[in-house]
C-alpha cells in the first residue's frame, strides 16, 4: 500500500522531533530560518502575452546534537509552500521539501530521509543529473529530493566513497522516462579519487523500472573527471543499460565536455562552455539516434552588489537557440533578480520548465527573494 503524502510529512516531522527527547546532557542547538520569494513573469507564446505571479515560502528548522568532538547528530526539515496565478487559474501547493537526519564522525557521514543527491563537475548540461533536476536558469536552484539513505566515507588519501539506497520515490528523477517500481529499492555508489592536477569519479546505480505495463532492470555506469590545467576542464560520461527487449533502444550513452576560464578584464569575466551528446541504440556501441546540445555562460560582477550573466544554448538537431540574460543585486538578506529570456515557441525538451523558469516563448521575469 502506497503511503499518502500527508502521512509521509507527519512521519518526517515525528522523526525530526525524536532527538528532542535525547538526554539534555548533550550539547544541543535548534535554529529556525527560511526564504520568501515573490515573482512576476510576462511571457509571450505564439501571439498571446501571458502574465503570472507567484509567491513561495520555504521555512527551515535545523537542529544539532554534539555527543563529543568527533560525533555529531544533526538534521533539517524544510517545507515548500507556493502559490502561482496566471490570472485565469490559481495553483496552491504545500509539500515536504527536505527532511534529513545526519550522523557525522571525523571520516564518515550517514544521511537518511528526503534529501538532495548530486555529483559531477558539469554545471549547465549535466550527464550525471541522475537524482535531481536543478535548472541552471532558476534563481532559486530548487529541486525535489529523493527518499533514501546515503553514506559517505573519506579516506586519508582524500578519496571519498559513497553508498546509497533509495526507496519510496514514485516520480521520475533527472532524465528518467519511467519511474522506479514501487516497493522495490534502488542502490548505487560512487568513488572519487585525487589524480594529477584534478580528481575523477566512478559511479554505479541499479533500479527496477516500471513502464506502467511491465518492469525491467536498468543499470547505469558513469565516469567523470575534472582538471585544473590553466583552464578548468572536465567531462561526464554515462552508459545506461535496459535489460529488456520490449523497448526500442536498450542502450543510452551520454557525454558532456566542458571548460571554464576567467579573463582578467575589469572585475573579471568568467566564461564557461559545455557540449553534450546523447545517443540511443539497440546495441552497446550502436548509434540509432543522437542529439547534441552546446551551451555557453558568461558572468561579470559589476560591483560588490551587482552581477550580470548570460546563458545561451544551441540544439543542433532542432537548430534552435535558447537565450537567458540575468541581472542580480544581492544584499545581506535580500536578492533582486531580473531575467530576460528568448526561447523557441515549441521547445524540444532542453528545459523541463516551471513557474520560475519558463521553457518556451520570450519575455521577462522579476523576482524578489528574502532570506532570514
Regions found by a protein language model. Give the residues of each.
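Repeated loop/turn-to-beta-strand initiation elements of outer-membrane beta-barrel proteins
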Residues: 30, 69-75, 107-110, 158-162, ...
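Detector for outer-membrane/organellar transmembrane beta-barrel domains
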Residues: 195, 226-315
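Outer-membrane beta-barrel "beta-signal"
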Residues: 329, 334-335, 342, 358-372
Amino acid at each position: 500500500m502506497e503511503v499518502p503524502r500527508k502521512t509521509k510529512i507527519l512521519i518526517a516531522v515525528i522523526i525530526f522531533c525524536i532527538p528532542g527527547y535525547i538526554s539534555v546532557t548533550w550539547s544541543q542547538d535548534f535554529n529556525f530560518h527560511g526564504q520568501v520569494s515573490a515573482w512576476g513573469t510576462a511571457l509571450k507564446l505564439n501571439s498571446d502575452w501571458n502574465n503570472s505571479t507567484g509567491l513561495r515560502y520555504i521555512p527551515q528548522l535545523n537542529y544539532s546534537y554534539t555527543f563529543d568532538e568527533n560525533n555529531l547528530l544533526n538534521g533539517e526539515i524544510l517545507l515548500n509552500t507556493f502559490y502561482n496565478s496566471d490570472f485565469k487559474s490559481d495553483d496552491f501547493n504545500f509539500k515536504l521539501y527536505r527532511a534529513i537526519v545526519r550522523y557525522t564522525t571525523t571520516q564518515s557521514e550517514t544521511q537518511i530521509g528526503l534529501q538532495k543527491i548530486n555529483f559531477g563537475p558539469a554545471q549547465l548540461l549535466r550527464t550525471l543529473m541522475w537524482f535531481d533536476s536543478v535548472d541552471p536558469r532558476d534563481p532559486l536552484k530548487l529541486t525535489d529530493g529523493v527518499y533514501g539513505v546515503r553514506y559517505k566515507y573519506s579516506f586519508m588519501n582524500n578519496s571519498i566513497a559513497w553508498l546509497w539506497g533509495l526507496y519510496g520515490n514514485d516520480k521520475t528523477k533527472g532524465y528518467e522516462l519511467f519511474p522506479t517500481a514501487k516497493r522495490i529499492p534502488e542502490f548505487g555508489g560512487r568513488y572519487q579519487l585525487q589524480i594529477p592536477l584534478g580528481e575523477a569519479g566512478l559511479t554505479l546505480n541499479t533500479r527496477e523500472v516500471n513502464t506502467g505495463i511491465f518492469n525491467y532492470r536498468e543499470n547505469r555506469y558513469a565516469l567523470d573527471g575534472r582538471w585544473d590545467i590553466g583552464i578548468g576542464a572536465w567531462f561526464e560520461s554515462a552508459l545506461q543499460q535496459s535489460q529488456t527487449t520490449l523497448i526500442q533502444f536498450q542502450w543510452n550513452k551520454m557525454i558532456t565536455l566542458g571548460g571554464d576560464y576567467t579573463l582578467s578584464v575589469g572585475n573579471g569575466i568568467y566564461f564557461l562552455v559545455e557540449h553534450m551528446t546523447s545517443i540511443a541504440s539497440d546495441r552497446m556501441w550502436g548509434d540509432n539516434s543522437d542529439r547534441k546540445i552546446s551551451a555557453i555562460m558568461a558572468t561579470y560582477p559589476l560591483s560588490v552588489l551587482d552581477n550580470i550573466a548570460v546563458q545561451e544554448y544551441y540544439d543542433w538537431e532542432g537548430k534552435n537557440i535558447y537565450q537567458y540574460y540575468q541581472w542580480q543585486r544581492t544584499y545581506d538578506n535580500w536578492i533582486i533578480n531580473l531575467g530576460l529570456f528568448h526561447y523557441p515557441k515549441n521547445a524540444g525538451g532542453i528545459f523541463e520548465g516551471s513557474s520560475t523558469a519558463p521553457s518556451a516563448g520570450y519575455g521577462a521575469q522579476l523576482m524578489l527573494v528574502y532570506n532570514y
